[in-house]
Amino acid sequence: MSKGTPSFGKHNKGKTHIRCRRCGRHSFNVRKGYCVACGFGRSKRMRRYSWQNKKSWTRVRLK
């Protein structure tokens, strides 16, 4: 059994992500045990950041 670069070829076997129980998206990491989309398994709160949504231009004064 060798380690390093030859071992990385074994990473493509099996599923990395399965369907999440909370958000329903195909983003629950089986190895890490949490959803990368909603944060299920890592946090009780939903994973949500302000940079995910585009900022509205209502406060900007047009020239």
Swiss-Prot record:
Chain intervals annotated as zinc finger (C4-type): 20-38
Binding site residues for Zn(2+): C20, C23, C35, C38
Cofactor binding comment, as recorded: Binds 1 zinc ion per subunit.
Keywords: Metal-binding, Ribonucleoprotein, Ribosomal protein, RNA-binding, rRNA-binding, Zinc, Zinc-finger
Any GO MF annotation of the entry: structural constituent of ribosome
GO CC, alphabetical: cytosolic large ribosomal subunit
UniProt protein name: Large ribosomal subunit protein eL37
Origin organism lineage: Archaea, Thermoproteota, Thermoprotei, Desulfurococcales, Desulfurococcaceae
Gene assigned in the entry: rpl37e
